[in-house]
Amino acid sequence: MLANKTALVTGSTSGIGLGIAKALARQGANIVLNGFGDVEGPKAEILALGVQVAYHGADMSKPAEIEDMMKFAAERFGRVDILVNNAGIQHVARVEDFPVEKWDAIIAINLTSAFHASRLAIPAMRAANWGRIINVASVHGLVGSAEKSAYVAAKHGVVGLTKVTALENATSGVTCNAICPGWVLTPLVQKQVDAKAVALGVSNEEAKNVLLGEKEPSMQFTTPEELGELAVFFCSPASNNVRGVAWNMDGGWVAQ
């Protein structure tokens, strides 16, 4: 379905981003990976799916590096047809105790990077009259949770950016939608599980159940693979008139 198209996925060396990158690769899209940590492993996983893969290590808090990444992708593959804004970090603290530098970093990486990547991708998408921007927001783009002020603010901003981007391109072949996962057992969430296990003096498995029980009625983690299939749908002809939605995959979290 996506042969001869290129997908750039930020924050894609692990977790949700890698799951989405692999799902798009299975549909034939060439992939530009971005992120920190192990790079060769994810590249090998994508190559094994029979597509081309490239990597750019842009720091998503730095606009100049984002611009370099977008230029790199265009030079390597012609243009970015599918942009998945997934890069994200987390910090937990009460508002009055929240470190200012952590606030600034979360807003920069979780929200502002999506703006910069989108503004740079849209002109070529519009020229081709086809493009997909998929913003990985969060259930926290729809509801709040205590001690996550920066993350919740950023993800609400991502949902707002999604709506505006969709409206501005509504008469073109360029769509923009957001994915809003509940709990996904990524390295980011595993840190929260570990902290809860220590705080409660329980096993890691018990801490996972406590975490799910607080918010997610299904008592199941959403998987990167499931989120990847939703991204594939957003890239399919069936989604041509799906524009500006914030699609939650959250086990019933916001239905309560």
Regions inferred by a protein language model and the residue ranges of each:
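Short, small/polar-rich loop/turn modules that mediate ligand/substrate recognition or access, typified
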Residues: 170, 175, 242-244
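Active-site helix of classical SDR
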Residues: 118, 154, 162
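Conserved glycine-rich cofactor-binding loop
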Residues: 6, 13-15
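Residue(s) in the substrate-gating loop at a strand-loop-helix junction
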Residues: 138
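Short C-terminal tail/terminal secondary-structure segment
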Residues: 3, 143, 232, 243-256
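Substrate-binding pocket helix/loop in short-chain dehydrogenase/reductase
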Residues: 66, 94-95, 102-107, 133, ...
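Conserved glycine-rich Rossmann-like NAD(P)H-binding loop of the short-chain dehydrogenase/reductase
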Residues: 27-42
